[in-house]
């Protein structure tokens, strides 16, 4: 078995973010380029509206993100967005060092996607770049980008950073969030929401508008706002206030015997199994002469036995369905 190392983990994550961002944006850019091909009507830019094209492009971005997050979640986290990575750094889910590796990978992946679409699909013009709509001031565009990014990032934090029984379908919620953001933002700002998405076409066509900075500052501020709200809710223990989505899962809970077996497996410490179903005393130790590990384990036992979510089996006759097989 190959030994894990931080360098190897960083390399795998970097490759995952580069390839994942490339695939996400390639299919999204290609859909936008296809929808905006001249056919007697104007391309869907912030200067003209066409709801059918708007829906097509918004759905393409949302579906492409959902599919690729699902694929790459276990490889790199499926971030594909510097704003998302920033938020994960703020909540301490990703280290700053790792972020400095992932963000350049995202920018490179996005740029390769933009170059691939430009090279593969006929036509000289890039029709998927972002720009402000008519009458939209820079500060207005900034706040639009801030709010759209806030929605996406907060969705990701609540569905992915919070581990629940619905985490496995989180990519659907993330895709819907981006879909909604594009429905709102395409006409007004081009719906950047992602610095890699805004930067890539501008780089390939070597054209950066004077207000390009809003596609970096807006998402960054949105990330700070989303991370701040998330941390605030966690500090206030929001899960104890409203209905608990995971109540059923917790009620199923663990029996004392299951909890005991888990602790024994993790700690590797033998003990005398008592018929009461409680976790008993440690072999070869006394209350006054337990090792630090024993004392720590004893604290865990007391917590588990006092936890109302852990069902205790019948005295001396544990239910066989409660025991691991």
UniProtKB/Swiss-Prot annotation:
Coiled coil: none annotated. This is Aquaporin-8. It is a multi-pass membrane protein. The chain crosses the membrane at residues 11-31, 53-73, 101-121, 141-161, 168-188, 213-233. Glycans are attached at residues 39, 47. Keywords: Cell membrane, Glycoprotein, Membrane, Repeat, Transmembrane, Transmembrane helix, Transport. The lineage of its organism: Eukaryota, Fungi, Dikarya, Ascomycota, Pezizomycotina. A motif (NPA 2) lies at residues 194-196. It is found in: Cell membrane. Residues 286-298 have a biased composition (Basic and acidic residues).
